[in-house]
UniProtKB/Swiss-Prot annotation:
Residues 26-213 form the BPL/LPL catalytic domain. It is found in: Cytoplasm. ATP binds at R68, G73, A74, V75, F76, K130. GO terms for molecular function: ATP binding; lipoate-protein ligase activity; lipoyltransferase activity. (R)-lipoate binds at K130. In the transfer reaction, the free carboxyl group of lipoic acid is attached via an amide linkage to the epsilon-amino group of a specific lysine residue of lipoyl domains of lipoate-dependent enzymes. This is Putative lipoate-protein ligase A. Pfam families: LplA-B_cat. It comes from Aeropyrum pernix (strain ATCC 700893 / DSM 11879 / JCM 9820 / NBRC 100138 / K1). One of its GO terms (cellular component) is cytoplasm. It is an enzyme of class 6 (ligase). Keywords: ATP-binding, Cytoplasm, Ligase, Nucleotide-binding.
């Protein structure tokens, strides 16, 4: 099943990641999700928010911080960034999870005539710029691998809000690409809307996972109910994230990708 989700608060959208992972495990089905998030900083499960996020700037701009269930560092989401998530009903290795989701991004870039490459295992670069980062959450019965794709996001906002961990470059742990983000619009000089990216990503997901299974609406309803509870009890709680608040659990519209509208 390939889903699209429209709107919703960052807290609910991240809660839905955990809920869909649980649905994948329980029902033994592969699910993919294409989605956008309003302005937010999404940090890894073990991220040190104080070291990775410019909290004062985030407060000044009204940007909430939300912690996801996967590892990795802090990333900035806005409506110019497309997210793709895949939920696989088995335990994958970290490298296998990264290879799966980066292949979807690379295939999408190839369809656009853009040459991309993987760096640092979980980044996709075009020239000297990072256009996509990915992370994974691995459980006993299912794996979540998700990635960003910077379409029109202003990279100066990322640099204002997310603190690059340059000591990792100095130690030789990662290449400088990891902390050199840029959007496809600025690299190519051509604007791509999210609905256009959704169409291309949908084809890339099918190439990676095969034709999606036809799953009933009851699984979607179960996922939304799970996410509703997770958002209320976990993801909107200030102590779980940061002192930033803005924890309203505003729900997105959730629909199969087969519906006629691609407007996200």
């Amino acid at each position: 099943m390939i889903l699209k989700t429209t709107g919703g608060s960052p807290h609910f959208n991240i809660a839905l990641e955990e809920a869909l992972l649980e649905e994948s495990a329980e029902h033994g089905i592969a699910i993919a999700r294409l989605w956008v998030n309003p302005d937010s900083i999404i940090v890894g499960y073990t991220s040190d928010v104080g070291r990775e996020v410019n909290i004062e700037q985030a407060r000044a701009e009204g940007v909430p911080v939300v912690r996801r269930i996967s590892g990795g560092g802090a990333v900035f989401h806005d409506l110019g960034n497309m997210n793709v998530s895949v939920y696989i009903p088995r335990r994958l290795g970290v490298d296998e999870a990264y290879a799966l989701v980066t292949s979807i991004i690379l295939k999408t870039l190839h369809r656009l005539g853009i040459e991309g490459r993987v760096e640092n295992g979980n980044d996709v670069a075009v020239g000297p710029w990072k256009v996509s980062g990915s992370a994974a959450a691995i459980r006993a019965r299912a794996t979540l691998a998700h990635a960003t794709l910077l379409l029109t996001t202003d990279p100066s906002r990322i640099r204002r809000l997310v603190i690059p961990q340059l000591h990792r470059v100095e130690r030789g742990e990662v290449t400088p690409v990891k902390y050199n983000p840029n959007s496809l619009e600025r690299i190519t000089g051509e604007r791509m809307e999210v609905w256009q990216a959704a169409r291309l990503l949908e084809e890339s997901v099918k190439h990676a996972l095969g034709e999606p299974e036809n799953v009933g609406r009851d699984i979607l309803q179960e996922a939304v109910i799970r996410a509703r509870e997770l958002c209320k009890t976990k993801y909107s709680q200030k102590g779980f994230w940061s002192p930033l608040g803005l924890g309203a659990c505003r729900e997105p519209q959730v629909a199969p990708m087969t519906s006629p509208s691609y407007v996200l």
